[in-house]
Design a protein with these regions (language model features):
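Conserved N-proximal alpha/beta basic substrate-recognition cap immediately N-terminal to
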Residues: 58-144
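A short, Lys/Arg-enriched amphipathic alpha-helix followed by its capping loop at the start of a domain
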Residues: 35-43
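Structural beta-sheet core signal
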Residues: 22, 46-47
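Short, polar loop motifs at secondary-structure junctions
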Residues: 48-55
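A short, basic/flexible loop-to-alpha-helix module at the beginning of a structural domain
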Residues: 2-14
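Glycine-rich adenosine-cofactor-binding loop
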Residues: 21-36
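Extreme N-terminal starter segment of soluble prokaryotic enzymes
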Residues: 15-20
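Hydrophobic beta-strand scaffold residues
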Residues: 44-45, 123
């Protein structure tokens, strides 16, 4: 069960304590990065991508990390757990939150939600069983 206790108590702390991690290097990643900066004053968002996308890698708003096998679930999970451990050592009040930029990464993050939450990462996705059910068109239409 997810711990519902807020880890960031005041809106003014969001820009300092929330550390977003975006998986995937496409235009949606850039949108996440810019909107997180605009809305919360987050100076840099970590972006994990398999290729060097210059629009992102050269942006002052990103901490761009090339992870060639980012589409491999175990590589992604280990990378995220390492980042969470890095933040925990730096400041235990930091709240890492991960976002996927495509269906593949959203599914991977949902599937490992409990594992990543155990590492201290906020995973804003529904549990995998429900995600799997509602993203299969035939079953989705039956449910509707």
């Amino acid at each position: 069960m997810t711990n519902l206790k807020p880890r960031i108590a005041h809106k003014e702390e969001v820009g300092k304590l929330l550390k977003p991690i975006v998986v995937g290097g496409d235009i949606l990643a850039y949108s996440y990065v810019r909107e997180l900066n605009r809305a919360f004053g987050i100076e840099q968002t970590i972006v994990l991508a398999a290729a060097d996308i210059k629009m992102l890698s050269t942006s002052r708003f990103t901490d761009y990390r090339l992870i060639p096998d980012v589409h491999d679930a175990e590589v992604l999970y280990a990378t995220l757990e390492g980042i969470a451990a890095e933040f925990a050592r730096e400041n235990p009040d930091i709240v890492p939150m991960v976002f996927g930029c495509d269906d593949c990464h959203a599914r991977m993050l949902s599937e490992a939600k409990h594992r990543l939450e155990a590492a201290g990462i906020v995973v804003p996705y529904i549990d995998f069983d429900l995600l799997d059910d509602i993203t299969q068109k035939r079953l989705f239409y039956e449910l509707c």
